[in-house]
Regions:
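Domain-level detector of nuclease and nuclease-like folds
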Residues: 2-134
């Protein structure tokens, strides 16, 4: 992972020997059309402190599902929002851990699907995180 000058982000120290993964907000697997695009996903600007179980579980599974939908039915616009609060965990390094993640999908026919994931260990199916888009 690389940093971007003049942008304050997390860094390797924030992920060292703890429960947090470098959760890609724009998944590397969705940018395999070129090495240049793939490399851009490995920036600290594109990652968030994400519970390891969530990142490797439901979050990853929904990323794969979105790629399947895009391949089968056409483009899917994806927007991610991180949720922070006054109760968000702050690591000793000074990095703030998001409380959760919103993922908003808009399909080419303007149909929408919205999801919310608490930033915690879970064993749900990704579909159980769907929320009302309104």
């Amino acid at each position: 992972f690389y940093t971007v000058s003049d942008v304050w982000t997390s860094d390797d120290n924030d992920y060292y020997k703890n429960e947090w993964d470098k959760g890609h907000m724009a998944p590397a697997g969705s940018f395999t059309d070129s090495w240049s695009n793939l490399a851009k996903t490995f920036s600290f600007v594109n990652c968030a402190l994400q519970k390891d179980n969530l990142n490797r579980g439901e979050w990853r599974e929904l990323e794969e599902q979105v790629r399947d939908w895009a391949r089968d039915i056409g483009p899917v616009n994806v927007r991610i929002e991180l949720k922070f609060s006054s109760n968000s965990t702050v690591l000793e390094t000074g990095a703030t851990v998001p409380d959760g993640f919103y993922k908003y999908l808009t399909f080419s026919d303007n149909r929408k699907m919205c999801f919310y994931f608490d930033n915690s260990a879970t064993d749900k199916d990704w579909s159980e995180h769907e929320i009302n888009c309104n």
